[in-house]
């Protein structure tokens, strides 16, 4: 695609600094998004998933909708609150998840996923990889997944004032879903109400999976889910719009305490102190426990080994996330070409009725993002970001029982944790013929209040620079160097009421540097290629020592992504490959949980082949995901000690058919994991007790719109 020296072409530089956000009502911005997505290598991709994609698929979680991205991997069995995600091997505590420019980075519990999203409520998903540029927002050191929810204008056809959508689906392994959406407009006002409900039973693993009870069913994997969205918009003028929305995601079911583990795959082990009535120790050594003691397999009264699933303490749990967001957008306001502002509140809660326990994380924030066109070939982006978070455990316990000694001791906990982040940024986009340059600067400041009562604060300056060279009409090269910082993440809210987590006197933000080179090449009108190679370093990474957060870790990562596509008429073929080599280092006897920082994942290949018939309107296709074997370091509870272990490679094939029966009815069919592969994702804790992927799954869903 040729880039001309126009206001459109200069915006390609957002590919180096951040990806663009499209307003489909504005053809200029839509053109910019197309240019950006065609000239960003693999670092930033817009419209990775669109409303149209979601309507013609059976996918009901992020794992499914982002399956074409080889650099993004999901662990955690059938998902929900066990759905762990990595981007280029960087774990969930190093990446961000945003919906409608709202976000929270505080974990409720380290054995639970931080990401909650129902794809049925989404219009589009964009992906950012590596450290973000100045305009990327707070704490984008290793990438982000950014979603935009649907509104009435996205669903109403021209001339339509009211609409209704019904959807229902069924899965053989094992679940069903149903949902409804109503939307309409009257004058300058539009509104949407949407709800989706999903019921998942305990799923079956692939061929050959069996737990120690002799079953092919993964225990404690059943889950009920619901997603609700209410959205109201007002077009104040032709150039200004206000939208108020409230979104809720909720998961409930009897889940394991450590949701990313399936302990029924191993036998119960312990010391003599762990024995219950009728039990005895065998003479078979089972390894060291967390305190370094020798453990042996435990036998029941009949001398038989005992499946270990009770250790995971399954119980009924409700996890809910409520987000309220007020957004304003405007354009053509003198020097300010475009503007967007929002203020939001997020409440994430984890309730365990049997324990009468409720843990909450409260977040409120605001963003102001301004764009100004300067002359014919330049663009200026500037703004401010603010976020405040508070972790509220079920209670503050100044005295509690020590898990190691069993004695009542002072915890040192005095208050709830709080954190405040403020960021200011400016970013220039400068077009000079075939070359487009971007320069940016970001100032970030945090104030952290630990549960010990201690407060620390620190500020960072983060520059960014990038370049796109349109070498030929169909060939462009890009490079960028981005710095970003991340403030200390608050200690998991569920344990913060009786577990001290202090902060060192001179605690600083983590500092990430990401260098990347890439290309985009349209070989012909039918064949396209893209690729990137990156180097990343995160210094002053946060670790713990003596229950204190310290700057005593280093993260390094490097790797590449390559992608290619061919299309001819109704035929499409895509292939992609990604490989990364993240490493973590700790100093001064500090420790960290590797699985939430960086995860060793094997080289990943994604492929897809499809053909779209015009009459009938039918698409048939195949998608494959193939992960090569990799050596990873297991985490606590993996029953594999601390030595590196080999994670097996695997390949999973999905077949699908999408039939648009008429303009109102869409029918989707799929066979996921068609060959019933028994596999374990690499994007979770390594070891024998990590969750197995779901086995063969026949799916069908229908969407009716009128």
Predicted regions mapped to residue ranges:
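Outer-membrane beta-barrel signature, preferentially recognizing the C-terminal barrel domain
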Residues: 310-333, 413-419, 456, 470, ...
């Amino acid at each position: 695609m040729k880039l001309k020296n126009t206001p459109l072409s200069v915006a390609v530089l957002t590919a180096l600094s951040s990806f663009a956000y499209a307003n489909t009502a504005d053809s200029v911005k839509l053109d910019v998004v197309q240019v950006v997505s065609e000239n960003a290598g693999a670092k930033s991709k817009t419209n990775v998933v669109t409303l149209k994609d979601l309507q013609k698929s059976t996918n009901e979680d992020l794992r499914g909708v982002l399956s074409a991205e080889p650099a993004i991997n999901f662990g955690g069995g059938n998902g929900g609150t066990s759905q762990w995600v990595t981007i280029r091997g960087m774990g969930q505590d190093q990446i961000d998840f945003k919906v409608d420019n709202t976000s929270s980075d505080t974990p409720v519990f380290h054995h639970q996923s931080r990401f909650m999203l129902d794809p049925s409520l989404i219009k589009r998903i964009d992906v950012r990889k590596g450290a973000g540029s100045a305009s990327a927002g707070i704490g984008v050191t290793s990438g982000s997944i950014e979603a935009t929810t649907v509104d009435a204008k996205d669903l109403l056809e021209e001339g339509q004032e009211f609409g209704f959508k019904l959807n229902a689906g069924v899965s053989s392994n094992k679940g069903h879903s149903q949902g409804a959406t109503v939307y309409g407009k009257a004058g300058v006002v539009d509104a949407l109400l949407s709800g989706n409900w999903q019921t998942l039973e305990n799923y079956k693993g692939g061929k050959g999976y069996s737990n120690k009870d002799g079953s092919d069913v993964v225990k404690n994997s059943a889950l009920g889910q619901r997603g609700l969205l209410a959205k109201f918009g007002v077009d104040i003028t032709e150039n200004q719009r206000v939208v108020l929305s409230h979104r809720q995601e909720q998961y409930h079911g009897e889940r394991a305490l450590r949701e990313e583990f399936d302990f029924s795959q191993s036998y119960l082990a312990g010391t003599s102190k762990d024995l219950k009535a009728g039990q005895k120790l065998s003479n078979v050594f089972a390894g060291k426990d967390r305190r370094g003691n020798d453990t042996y397999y435990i036998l029941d009264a009949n001398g038989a080994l005992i499946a270990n699933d009770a250790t995971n303490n399954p119980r009924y749990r409700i996890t809910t996330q409520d987000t309220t967001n007020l957004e304003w957008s405007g354009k053509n306001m003198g020097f300010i070409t475009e503007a967007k502002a929002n203020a939001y509140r997020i409440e994430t809660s984890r309730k365990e009725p049997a324990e009468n326990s409720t843990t909450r994380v409260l977040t409120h924030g605001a963003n102001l993002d301004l764009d100004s066109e300067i002359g014919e070939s330049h663009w200026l982006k500037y703004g401010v970001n603010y976020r405040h978070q508070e972790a509220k455990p079920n209670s503050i316990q100044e005295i509690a029982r020590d898990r190691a000694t069993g004695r009542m001791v002072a915890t040192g906990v005095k208050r709830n944790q709080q954190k405040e982040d403020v960021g200011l940024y400016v970013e220039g986009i400068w077009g000079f013929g075939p070359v487009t340059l971007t320069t940016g600067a970001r100032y970030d400041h945090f104030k952290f209040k630990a549960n010990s009562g201690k407060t620390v604060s620190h500020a960072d300056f983060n520059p960014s620079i990038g370049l796109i060279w349109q070498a030929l009409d169909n060939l462009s090269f890009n490079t960028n160097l981005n710095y970003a910082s991340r403030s200390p993440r608050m200690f998991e809210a569920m344990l913060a009421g009786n577990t001290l987590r202090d902060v060192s006197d001179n605690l600083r933000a983590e500092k990430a540097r990401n260098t990347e080179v890439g290309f985009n090449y349209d070989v012909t009108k039918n064949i396209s290629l893209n690729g990137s190679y990156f180097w990343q370093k995160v210094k002053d990474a946060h670790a713990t020592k003596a229950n204190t957060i310290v700057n005593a870790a280093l993260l390094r990562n490097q790797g590449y992504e390559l992608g290619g596509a061919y299309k001819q008429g109704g035929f499409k073929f895509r292939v992609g490959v990604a490989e990364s080599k993240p490493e973590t280092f700790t100093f001064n006897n500090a420790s960290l949980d590797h699985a939430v920082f960086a995860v060793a994942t094997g080289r990943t290949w994604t492929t897809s082949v499809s053909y779209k018939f015009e009459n009938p309107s039918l698409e048939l296709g195949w998608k494959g995901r193939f992960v090569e074997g990799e050596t990873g370091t297991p985490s606590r509870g993996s029953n594999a000690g601390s030595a590196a272990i080999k994670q097996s490679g695997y390949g999973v094939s999905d077949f699908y058919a999408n039939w648009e029966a008429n303009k109102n009815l869409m029918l989707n069919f799929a066979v996921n994991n068609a060959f019933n592969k028994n596999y374990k994702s690499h994007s979770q804790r390594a070891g024998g007790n990590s969750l197995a992927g779901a086995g063969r799954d026949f799916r069908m869903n229908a969407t009716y719109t009128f």
